[in-house]
């Protein structure tokens, strides 16, 4: 879902919908926790829990009574509570939470697609995500619109890595429309589609593409687990997350 943000509460509502979408797919397919098709969704949900928690905290900080507004700075470790320090802390939490959501969420989507490519033996001419995603979607018979969806989150992530400026491949612009929400990335210009609602909506639409991928006959007939190779390399176990 997408909702123009007028408050931290609106941000939290958009992130909640992303969480619910991930939960729906986890329950729909029922893959084991160490299968990349579940692990990716679980990990997107985990980072979303963090972002929604910060959004709710900032909302309470701005709207709460005097007691709440006194307690939160203490919990955050603010030794000096004035307008400037409160604003700086709030901005820092908001920006870092937003960056974490797109960075970690997009990584999980890209990692999942790489793992599926490896399992199905899908090769691409380049190691880059765009080419790997294109090769997989072509192999599964899915359309170019799905590739545009997956690329939208990647473009947001890349722009935030460049102080919000889009640097297109060979100077190219990129535009997409996700369920009526327009995303425009103009080379050399600051992007205006990297708000929390834009990020949550783009990730949710990418999760929808994962749903299409999981539903493809080639995946439905796959006889075994598709392990998360990144988790294996860094030594993560296959334990399920604890619900907050």
Indicate residue ranges for each PLM-predicted region:
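Short, charged amphipathic alpha-helical segments flanked by flexible coils
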Residues: 122-140, 168-186
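Short, contiguous, well-structured surface segments enriched in hydrophobic/aromatic residues
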Residues: 76-77, 98-131
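Charged/polar positions within long, soluble alpha-helices
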Residues: 113-121, 158-169
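Extended intrinsically disordered or low-complexity regions, especially N/C-terminal cytosolic tails and loops
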Residues: 1-103, 144-155, 171-244
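A structural signal for alpha-helix termini and helix-coil/disorder junctions
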Residues: 119-122, 139, 209-212, 216
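A contiguous pocket-lining binding segment that forms or flanks enzyme active sites
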Residues: 133-163
